[in-house]
């Protein structure tokens, strides 16, 4: 892919936005090196990586990547036998910590059944060096300072040094407290000169304290003197400082030597973590842009649904459907300038580059985009009315280069094709260039304001016309792309709206040839029919989306029901048994007391009555239900075939075999639900005489699925707890393993109330405040059982 095309389509601006989502310089560097791939399998892999990253962000909100640092230069120094300083060692330790946390994080996701084939394999490459990490953690802090816990010798030296410094300060403070201090000292402070503790003495009293003069004030009136009484203590202090420095150097050298044995492993861990940071940055970028993972085509098929230009304001940009490569391979967009034709070209081109770089694209679900070997673009500033020869020459030079390199795996974007020269010659050139591009097998989208090219889409089976809608009421373009409808002139309508005399407009219409007038009327009619069809299509698509959501909800609820049913029955039976056992024990005690009374001579209590009472209590105890799959009666096994009616033994439901997955498993249609069922769990049902049935179809719009977070900021206390209760039910039904509840920091009352409520909820496994990247103690993370 040419860098020139990336610049024309502003792919560099996308990369700049993407860097804002990286957590480390390693992620940023990977983004700067990002370029569109042209190999179909490579693009598939990078898209799947991003999709897996997005899945993790949806489930967990974030990943433990904070603290990752570029340590490759540190490892280079270790390779040549050099020692690292404390900060460099800490940064390596931080990377080891992130490696361990990331591996544990990924293992937790994999253990609960989250499918992450690519990122799971990437996680497997991380090596946990727990002992090395711990050695660094007890040796240096985040500022690079060597800690007392690094060695016993260092701890002893520093303890002795602190005591010595205390003795020096105590002695000097005694001078400051002396009753003559105000007379002999310039200021009652202890300071340091030449790394020695000194006091500021007035010039005339320098002989009173003896010792060494280390400095004097600018005026010479104050001398900074180390009194003779602390010289020896200061000397001892200096000696201890030298020992401390020597021990620190020994510790750093020792740790550096131990790290040198793991250079390759640390290098690989850092590289893998950089990949994770890059992938999560792509995922977070896609989430912020409300983007989707597109289907990929290796056959030049593009079908973008509600595609938006990613660099324009999402609240204002007009989304358009763009399709190419099935019924036609060339689109000619006609119509006046400033109508949004160029934005359409750039949207298609930029989304292609993004998709081939492994980025999600701003469009709706089920959008398809092609993977091209080459993307060519001849797009310039063609908005001015006057075109110079130099501009025409520049465009033609570019087009010559494009036609010399294009192949059948190419996408060409021509903006204002043939502009800058005589209109008649320019239109003829444009047609010839489009034919030449098609002959090379390329996919082409071209814009032009030449009316002569309107016929191109009708005269060529591989081509179609398109236009950008214009609202004559507001005298402005709507930026809505209309594929299949050529652009028409709006000059008469605009003139009438602006107040031009109707007589002039009528005369002007009479000067236009009948064929052109009829063509404009036909285009106008096409636009109206197209708008009506699009409205009906959108309504149908919305209904289909609602039906799809309903089906997903039902599938999830039915699956959860069958999974939980037996468990709930057994739990209820066990609880009932516990209650009865307790009652039985109490009854046993009562019976024992009654028997004792009988032995002591109490009358009226029969032995058989006691036995009967105990037997009745024992029979009241329910037995724990052990649910097993009912076994079909032994008979000659039936050879299952597609279309057979069957009973699913574990569910007690009837269904129909759709297709065989393997000898051990079938796809079975159970009502409106399609499920994978093991062959041993199926029982053949003899076909019954068909009965006439009345089929009633009803589509209801399902509610929005529960989000992974609940925002309570600004809510009253009682209302907030009600919302939490309802939200937890929705989140459990949606299958989230954990959710985030945002309550803010404030006075802490809401946070405390929410925390107490969560502690007593039967389905909550654990709660914790969010990490810094998750919102700190303004957010509570809830993990379900």
Curated annotation (Swiss-Prot):
Pfam families: MSSS (PF20297), MutS_V (PF00488), Smr (PF01713)
Gene3D superfamilies named in the record: 3.30.1370.110, P-loop containing nucleotide triphosphate hydrolases
Entry EC number(s): 3.1.-.-, 3.6.4.-
Annotated ranges, domain Smr: 710-785
Gene Ontology molecular function terms on file: ATP binding; ATP hydrolysis activity; ATP-dependent DNA damage sensor activity; endonuclease activity; mismatched DNA binding; ribosomal large subunit binding; rRNA binding
InterPro entries for this protein: DNA_mismatch_repair_MutS_C (IPR000432), DNA_mismatch_repair_MutS_core (IPR007696), DNA_mismatch_repair_MutS_sf (IPR036187), MSSS (IPR046893), MutS (IPR045076), MutS2 (IPR005747), P-loop_NTPase (IPR027417), Smr_dom (IPR002625)
UniProt entry keywords in alphabetical sequence: ATP-binding, DNA-binding, Endonuclease, Hydrolase, Nuclease, Nucleotide-binding, RNA-binding, rRNA-binding
Annotated binding of ATP, by residue: 335-342
Domain of life assignment: Bacteria
Ranges annotated as spanning the membrane: none
Top EC category: hydrolase
A biological process from GO: negative regulation of DNA recombination
Role, per record: Endonuclease that is involved in the suppression of homologous recombination and thus may have a key role in the control of bacterial genetic diversity.
Family: Belongs to the DNA mismatch repair MutS family. MutS2 subfamily.
SUBUNIT field: Homodimer. Binds to stalled ribosomes, contacting rRNA.
Protein name: Endonuclease MutS2
Organism whose genome encodes this protein: Listeria monocytogenes serotype 4b (strain F2365)
């Amino acid at each position: 892919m040419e860098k020139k095309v990336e610049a024309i389509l502003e792919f560099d601006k996308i990369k700049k936005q993407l860097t804002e989502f990286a957590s480390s310089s390693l992620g940023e560097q990977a983004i700067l090196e990002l370029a569109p791939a042209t190999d179909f399998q490579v693009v598939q892999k990078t898209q799947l990586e991003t999709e897996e990253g997005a899945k993790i962000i949806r489930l967990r909100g974030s990943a433990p990547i904070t603290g990752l640092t570029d340590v490759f230069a540190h490892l280079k120094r270790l390779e040549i036998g050099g020692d690292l300083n404390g900060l460099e060692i800490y940064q390596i330790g931080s990377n080891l910590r992130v490696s361990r946390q990331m591996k544990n994080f990924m293992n937790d996701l994999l253990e609960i059944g989250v499918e992450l084939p690519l990122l799971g394999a990437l996680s497997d490459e991380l090596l946990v060096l727990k002992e090395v990490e711990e050695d660094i953690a007890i040796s240096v802090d985040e500022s690079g300072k060597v800690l007392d816990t690094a060695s016993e010798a260092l701890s002893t030296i520093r303890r002795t040094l602190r005591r010595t410094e205390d003795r020096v300060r105590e002695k000097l403070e005694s001078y400051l407290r002396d009753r003559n201090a105000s007379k002999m000292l310039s200021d009652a402070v202890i300071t340091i000169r030449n790394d020695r503790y000194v006091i500021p003495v007035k010039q005339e009293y320098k002989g009173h304290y003896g010792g060494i003069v280390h400095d004097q004030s600018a005026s010479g009136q104050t001398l900074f003197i180390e009194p003779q009484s602390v010289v020896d203590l200061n000397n001892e202090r200096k000696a201890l400082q030298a020992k401390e420095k020597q021990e620190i150097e020994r510790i750093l050298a020792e740790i550096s030597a131990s790290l040198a044995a793991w250079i390759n492993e640390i290098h690989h861990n850092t590289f893998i973590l950089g990949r994770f940071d890059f992938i999560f940055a792509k995922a977070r970028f896609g989430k912020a842009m409300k983007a989707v993972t597109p289907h990929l085509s290796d056959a030049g098929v593009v079908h973008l649904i509600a595609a938006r230009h990613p660099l324009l304001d999402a609240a204002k940009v007009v989304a358009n459907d763009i399709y190419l490569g099935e019924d036609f391979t060339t689109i000619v967009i006609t119509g006046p300038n400033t109508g949004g034709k160029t934005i359409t070209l750039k949207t298609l081109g930029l989304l292609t580059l993004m998709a081939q770089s492994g980025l999600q694209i701003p469009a709706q679900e089920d959008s398809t985009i092609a993977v091209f070997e080459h993307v060519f673009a001849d797009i310039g500033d063609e908005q001015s009315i006057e075109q110079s020869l130099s501009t025409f020459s520049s465009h033609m030079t570019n087009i010559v280069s494009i036609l010399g390199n294009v192949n059948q795996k190419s996408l060409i974007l021509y903006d204002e094709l043939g502009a800058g020269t005589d209109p008649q010659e320019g239109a003829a050139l444009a047609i010839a260039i489009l034919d030449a591009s098609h002959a090379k097998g390329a996919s082409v989208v071209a814009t032009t304001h030449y009316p002569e090219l309107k016929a191109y889409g009708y005269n060529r089976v591989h081509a179609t016309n398109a236009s950008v809608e214009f609202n004559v009421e507001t005298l402005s373009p709507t930026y809505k792309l209309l594929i299949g409808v050529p652009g028409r002139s709006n000059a008469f309508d605009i003139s009438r709206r602006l107040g031009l005399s109707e007589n002039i407009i009528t005369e002007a219409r009479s000067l236009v040839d009948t064929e052109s007038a009829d063509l404009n009327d036909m285009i106008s009619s096409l636009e109206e029919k197209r708008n009506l069809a699009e409205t009906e299509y959108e309504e149908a698509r919305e209904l289909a989306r609602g039906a799809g959501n309903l089906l997903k909800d039902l599938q999830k609820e039915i699956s959860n029901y069958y999974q939980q049913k037996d468990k709930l029955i057994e739990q209820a039976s066990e609880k009932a048994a516990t209650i009865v056992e307790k009652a039985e024990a109490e009854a046993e005690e009562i019976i024992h007391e009654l028997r004792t009374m009988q032995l002591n001579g109490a009358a009226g209590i029969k032995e058989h009555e006691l036995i009967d009472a105990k037997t009745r209590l024992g029979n009241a105890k329910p037995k724990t239900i052990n649910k097993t799959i009912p076994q079909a009666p032994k008979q000659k096994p039936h050879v299952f075939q597609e279309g057979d009616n069957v009973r699913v033994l574990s569910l007690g439901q009837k269904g129909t075999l759709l297709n065989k997955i393997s000898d051990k498993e079938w796809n079975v249609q159970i009502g409106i639900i399609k499920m994978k069922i093991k062959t041993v769990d199926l029982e053949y049902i003899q076909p019954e005489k068909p009965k006439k049935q009345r089929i009633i179809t009803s589509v209801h719009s399902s509610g929005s699925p529960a989000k992974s977070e609940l925002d309570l900021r600004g809510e009253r206390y009682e209302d907030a707890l009600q919302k939490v209760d309802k939200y937890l039910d929705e989140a459990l039904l949606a299958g989230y393993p954990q959710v985030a509840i945002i309550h803010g920091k404030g006075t802490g009352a809401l946070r405390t109330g929410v925390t107490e409520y969560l502690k007593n909820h039967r389905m909550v496994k654990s709660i914790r405040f969010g990490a810094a990247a998750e919102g700190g103690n303004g957010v509570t993370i809830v993990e379900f059982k």
